[in-house]
Amino acid sequence: IFINVKCSSPQQCLKPCKKAFGQHAGGKCINGKCKCYP
């Protein structure tokens, strides 16, 4: 699930993804945007 957070590395997506989807969510940075894996 893409969220509206810009990124340049996967680490930048972990906090926003966990905030949006809970502690077990993961995140990746794809084409400059965060993609979360709830």
UniProtKB/Swiss-Prot annotation:
Disulfide bonds join 7-29, 13-34, 17-36. It holds the Pfam family Toxin_2. The record marks 28 as: Basic residue of the functional dyad. The record marks 37 as: Aromatic residue of the functional dyad. It is found in: Secreted. GO terms for molecular function: ion channel inhibitor activity; potassium channel regulator activity; toxin activity. Expressed by the venom gland. SUPFAM superfamilies: Scorpion toxin-like. InterPro entries: Scorpion_toxin-like_sf, Scorpion_toxinS_K_inh. Keywords: Calcium-activated potassium channel impairing toxin, Disulfide bond, Ion channel impairing toxin, Neurotoxin, Potassium channel impairing toxin, Secreted, Toxin, Voltage-gated potassium channel impairing toxin. Blocks human voltage-gated potassium channels Kv1.2/KCNA2 (IC(50)=0.3 nM), Kv1.3/KCNA3 (IC(50)=8.3 nM) and Shaker IR (with inactivation domain removed) (IC(50)=12 nM) and blocks intermediate conductance calcium-activated potassium channel KCa3.1/KCNN4 (IC(50)=6.4 nM). Has the structural arrangement of an alpha-helix connected to a beta-sheet by disulfide bonds (CSalpha/beta). Negative results: does not block voltage-gated potassium channel Kv1.1/KCNA1. Belongs to the short scorpion toxin superfamily. Potassium channel inhibitor family. Alpha-KTx 02 subfamily. This is Potassium channel toxin alpha-KTx 2.15. It comes from Centruroides tecomanus.
